[in-house]
C-alpha cells in the first residue's frame, strides 16, 4: 500500500454538482447532460489530474431515480456519445471513472411500481428475500459491467433510503441486512469484472457500533474501500480500531463540504470550508484512513474551487499542512503570490471561521445543505437558504453580515491578478449578504 497518499482518492457527486449553470426549475436530481456541462466536466478533470485525485465517481450517468421497465433503451445515442467523451477524457488524463450505484434501493422506484414481487411493501427498497429483486439488481450490475461504457468500477449505496421491513427482513439488524445485499452484489461484480474498483458508502448505515463490526468485516473482504459519511467512529474514538479490523481501505467524505445547490445561481453563496476539510482529512490519515469520497464543487464559484483544491491536495499529499494547501489553492485560483498570498490566506481563514463559528453545523457530519435537497413545498424551484435560516440565530446572522461586510471591504483593497475570480468572489459575498437581509 502506498503510504505517501490516500489509496482511494475519489471525487464524487451527482452529474450536475460541478455544473457552472444551475437547473432552477427541475426537481432534484436533474441529470441533464448538455455541452456546457461536458465542458465543465473536462475542466474539472484537468484540475483533478493536476492534483492527483485518481477516481471520478458520478451518479446520474444513465438515470436519475429509476431504471426503466422494461430494461431497455436506457440511454439514447447522444447521451452515450457524451459518456464516451467523458470516459475517454478521464482515461487520457490517467484517471478512472466509477459509477454511483444503488443496491436494492435508489434506482428502483419504477421497478417496484411495475414488477410484482420485488418489494414487500416498501415504495423505495426491494426485498432481500425476493428472487425477482435480485434478478433486477443483477441486470443493473451486468449492464454497468459492459465494457462499452468505459467504466472502471462502482461505489455502492444501500441504506440512504432505508431498507425492507417485512417480517423476515426485520429479523436482521440493519448492518446484517445491508451486508447481505452488499456482499452478494460485490461478489457478482468481482466475478464479472475482476479489474474493477468496488467502493461502498455508508449513507444511512452506522459503522461505529461494536456489535456490528463483524458485518463490516464481511463487507471489507469483498470491496476495495468503504467510507463513513457522518464520522461517528472518530467522535467516539473508535476509528483507528475499526481501520485495523478491516480488510479494505476505510475513509470518510472529507469532514465538511457544501452540498452543491442544484437550483441556485453559482454566485449566490460564499462559504469557504477548505481548512475544516483539510484538517478532517489529516485526522483521518492519522487514524489510518486511506479512502475518501470527496464531493464535486462548481468551480464557477471561486470559494468552492479553493475549498476543493485544499482537500484534494491532502488526499494526494497527506503530510501537507492545511495552511500550505490553502496558499497553494489561492495561487492557482487568484494568481496571488508572496505577501499578497499570505494576506489572502489569512482573509480566507477568517471568512471560513465567520460562518462556522456561528453555525450549528459540526465538521464531520457530512454535507452542509444551502437549500433543502428536496424542498417539499416545491421541489422544482430554488429553495430557501436553510444554511442561514436554520443554522444561525437572528443575532448570529446579524453578526455574520457585519463581518462579511468588513471582509468584503478588505478584499476590495487587495491586489488580485485574476480579475474574474475577484469579481466572482465579490458577487458571491454580495449574494450571501442579500440572503441574510431577506431573512431579517
Predicted segments, located by residue:
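Substrate-binding groove of N-acetylhexosamine-processing glycoside hydrolases
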Residues: 1-4, 9-10, 27, 37, ...
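Feature activates predominantly on carbohydrate-active enzymes
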Residues: 1-138, 142, 146-151, 190, ...
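Glycine-rich, histidine-containing beta strand-loop boundary motifs that form or position
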Residues: 57-60, 99-103, 157-158, 200-202, ...
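Short, internal active-site loops enriched in acidic
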Residues: 63, 104-105, 159-163, 203-208
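Short acidic, glycine/serine/threonine-rich loops at helix termini
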Residues: 68-69, 109-115, 119, 166-169, ...
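Active-site cleft segment of glycoside hydrolase catalytic domains centered on the general acid/base Glu
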Residues: 114, 120-131, 158-192
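Active-site/ligand-binding-proximal alpha/beta "capping" segment
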Residues: 154
Amino acid at each position: 500500500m502506498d503510504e505517501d497518499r490516500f489509496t482511494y482518492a475519489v471525487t464524487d457527486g451527482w452529474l450536475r454538482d460541478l455544473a457552472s449553470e444551475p437547473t432552477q426549475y427541475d426537481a432534484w436530481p436533474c441529470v441533464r447532460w448538455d455541452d456546457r456541462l461536458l465542458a465543465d466536466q473536462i475542466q474539472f478533470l484537468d484540475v483533478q489530474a493536476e492534483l492527483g485525485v485518481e477516481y471520478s465517481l458520478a451518479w446520474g450517468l444513465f438515470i436519475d431515480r429509476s431504471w426503466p421497465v422494461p430494461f431497455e433503451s436506457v440511454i439514447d445515442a447522444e447521451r452515450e456519445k457524451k459518456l464516451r467523451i467523458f470516459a475517454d477524457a478521464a482515461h487520457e488524463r490517467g484517471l478512472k471513472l466509477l459509477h454511483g450505484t444503488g443496491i436494492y434501493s435508489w434506482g428502483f422506484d419504477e421497478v417496484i411500481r411495475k414488477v410484482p414481487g420485488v418489494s414487500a411493501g416498501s415504495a423505495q427498497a426491494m426485498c432481500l428475500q425476493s428472487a425477482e429483486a435480485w434478478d433486477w439488481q443483477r441486470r443493473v450490475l451486468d449492464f454497468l459491467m459492459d465494457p462499452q461504457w468505459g467504466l472502471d468500477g462502482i461505489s455502492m449505496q444501500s441504506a440512504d433510503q432505508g431498507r425492507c421491513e417485512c417480517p423476515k427482513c426485520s429479523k436482521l439488524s440493519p448492518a446484517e441486512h445491508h451486508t447481505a445485499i452488499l456482499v452478494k452484489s460485490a461478489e457478482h461484480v468481482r466475478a464479472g469484472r475482476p479489474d474493477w474498483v468496488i467502493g461502498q458508502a455508508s449513507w444511512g448505515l452506522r459503522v461505529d457500533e461494536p456489535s456490528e463490526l463483524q458485518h463490516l468485516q464481511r463487507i471489507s473482504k469483498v470491496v476495495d474501500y468503504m467510507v463513513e459519511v457522518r464520522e461517528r467512529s472518530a467522535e467516539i474514538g473508535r476509528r483507528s480500531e475499526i481501520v485495523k479490523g478491516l480488510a479494505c481501505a476505510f475513509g470518510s467524505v472529507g469532514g465538511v463540504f457544501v452540498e452543491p445547490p442544484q437550483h441556485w445561481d453559482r454566485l449566490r453563496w460564499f462559504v469557504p470550508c477548505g481548512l475544516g476539510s483539510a484538517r478532517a482529512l489529516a485526522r483521518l490519515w492519522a487514524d489510518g484512513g486511506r479512502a475518501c469520497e470527496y464531493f464535486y464543487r462548481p468551480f464557477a464559484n471561486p470559494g468552492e474551487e479553493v475549498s476543493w483544491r485544499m482537500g484534494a491536495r491532502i488526499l494526494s499529499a497527506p503530510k501537507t499542512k492545511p495552511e500550505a494547501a490553502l496558499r497553494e489553492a489561492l495561487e492557482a485560483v487568484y494568481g496571488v503570490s508572496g505577501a499578497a498570498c499570505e494576506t489572502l490566506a489569512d482573509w480566507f481563514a477568517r471568512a471560513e471561521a465567520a460562518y462556522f463559528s456561528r453555525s450549528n453545523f459540526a465538521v464531520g457530519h457530512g454535507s452542509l445543505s444551502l437549500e433543502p435537497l428536496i424542498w417539499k413545498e416545491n421541489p422544482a424551484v430554488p429553495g430557501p437558504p436553510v444554511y442561514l435560516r436554520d443554522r444561525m440565530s437572528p443575532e448570529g446572522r446579524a453578526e455574520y453580515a457585519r463581518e462579511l461586510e468588513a471582509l468584503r471591504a478588505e478584499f476590495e483593497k487587495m491586489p488580485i491578478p485574476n480579475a474574474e475570480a475577484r469579481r466572482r468572489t465579490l458577487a458571491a459575498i454580495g449574494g450571501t449578504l442579500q440572503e441574510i437581509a431577506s431573512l431579517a
